[in-house]
Amino acid sequence: MLYDIIKSLRKILLLTLIYVFFASFAFSEEIEKDNIFLIDDAPFDVHKSKIEEIQKSKTEYDSYGFRLKESITSTLPSDEECINHKRPVYLLDTATTRYFEKGPLDSFHTGFFYKGSLPISMIQGGVTHTDYTQNNIENHFRGYLKNGKTSFNISTRYTPRKDLDFFQFLIGDLFVSHQLTQHNRIVFGNSRTHTGEEGSKPDWQVPLISYSQISRNFGNIRKFGARVVGEYDLVEYDFGGYSSDSYFREFFPRVEFTGWVNFKPLGKTNGKYGDLKIGGGISSGHNNFTYNVAGAYARYQYKKFRADFEFANADGYNGNLGLSKKHARGLYTTVYYRITPKVELLARYDFFQPDLDVSKKDIKEYVVGLNYYLKGQGLRFMLNYIFRQSDFGNDSHRIILGTQIML
């Protein structure tokens, strides 16, 4: 009897193995075609509008596993996506983005930003020294709602500052943006004020390793408030009311107003004569004392050539380096030439008078730079040479090697 039971079990086991063997052939090709993630892990909920796009762009894999080259190619953005240097390029965005089929959230993007430099400083009549600088280490989080009009941005920063504690400097962007009309949106939260044209740009968009002197003194600052941002063919504007505090040091000490308008006279010519932008604005507020910053900006771009100019005058200011009662003034002008789609050569003259109430002494910086955009702003290598003439000390030379990575 025991022999008959064992014989029956052997038949059942044999039939099971035969079924599994043939079933694997029957379904393997169908699973391989439909599996948009190309791995056996349970997939996330993906928004339906994205599934077809992912399926069409996916790379086919054989039964022996991943092909490393094809896997990397399918993950990284294409060169066409990296041409526009005004937009961020997160190299791993396709891998770090989650899409949602249910709920109000359409997609959630997680990014990483790093910008570091290695400066070699040579002071005339002094010593030469080299030090490594971590300009930025940040996490970026972006979410988009299904209504197609609302999004939110959060950024956290991990490079310490001596004048701030860790948590004061930790939060960068913390705002919600809503598209009111086709050309206008409202922004509420902690965001960059439009104090100057370059001073309103994020660090990854600045063409050189460092901001200009007026931008790093008067601008490059976030404050908590509400903004209305508009963009048309012939004009763009940014008006905002904010708390005059920065870095969460005080709760609403007083109010600051910042407004900036750019006119684009060639906006209706489709680039036939190039792109011309002329504008200006003010930033005025009170925090223990009243401060006012006024500026003007001009830029012209034609094919591979671009040039810009910015001037600012401050009777007190509240920028990245803190509050100051000083009367300061400065300007910069930059010339750019795009040698190839990935290589850019630029030169800048930067002039700054830090305290006109005391003297008209100034600091001049002559900068030559080379940018190599291997993957747009997502992977950029920079080389800057700076000759600095200062009425406050010895002149100096600096050679700076920089790297920018967005993942």
Predicted regions and their residues:
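Outer membrane beta-barrel
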Residues: 99-121, 130-246, 253-258, 262-267, ...
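Outer membrane beta-barrel transmembrane domains
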Residues: 336-382
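Outer-membrane beta-barrel "beta-signal"
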Residues: 259-261, 368-374, 379, 395-407
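Transmembrane beta-barrel architecture of outer-membrane proteins
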Residues: 158, 170-172, 243, 255-257, ...
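Detector for outer-membrane/organellar transmembrane beta-barrel domains
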Residues: 103-107, 144-150, 260-355
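N-terminal periplasmic/intermembrane-space "pro-region" immediately following the signal or transit peptide
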Residues: 26-114, 118-122, 407
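Bacterial N-terminal signal peptides
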Residues: 15-24
